[in-house]
Amino acid sequence: MKKIIIYSIILILFLNCRDKSNVQPNLEEPVVAASSNAQKINSTLQELLRFADISETNDMDVADVVGFKMMDVRGNITSLDLEDGATLFKSYPSSESKQNRPIMEINDSNKVLLMVKGKGFGGPIWAKLLMDATTHEILKVKFEHKAETEGYGAGITRASFQNQFIGKTIKISNNTFALVQNGKEWIKGEQPIDGISGATVTSENVVHMLNEGLLGYAQYFQVR
């Protein structure tokens, strides 16, 4: 009888030890966390970060690097989370309303990314601008369009046209840019811009878009 009890105890201990040896460590949680963080960098955020010359890393928390805001038509500024901020930038060019202007601030710097939009000869045109919010200098610009004519209005995407705006300091009380086309000043302003040959309408609309769009951010610059 005693032997049976002893054998039973040994068997129970053996089975218990074997069960514990089969327990696998939970390796899934860190993977889930990393995946969740990676999802924050969607395609729109990637585009904005690259335009702002921000290098992406696998462990980067975007919220530590940039912050999004929105300015309404009255100049009221509201903070947005990453998803809402990226969505506003993505939808802004195709939206007919200019009431809510997107802002992306680069943390621990004076840099800010803004967007302006207008109408070209063939359809919507828009631009992203990387600026120094303190000096009001344009650091980088990228024009885009939906249906401008190749060889003419589509030339707004050429570096030779875009580079005219880089390094210019904007005015927040009147027109920054003037348009000069075929020796004639079509739009009055502080900084002359050479229009694209054969694309006077598109050139005019780009300059109007920048002048009016940047003036629309005047209250943002005033509170910086």
Question: What is the predicted role of each segment?
Answer:
Residues 18-224:
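Flexible, solvent-exposed loop/hinge segments and secondary-structure transition points
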Residues 8-9, 138:
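A ubiquitous, low-specificity "background" feature that marks scattered single residues
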Residues 13-16:
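C-terminal motif of bacterial Sec signal peptides marking the signal peptidase cleavage site
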Residues 2-8:
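Sec-dependent signal peptide recognition
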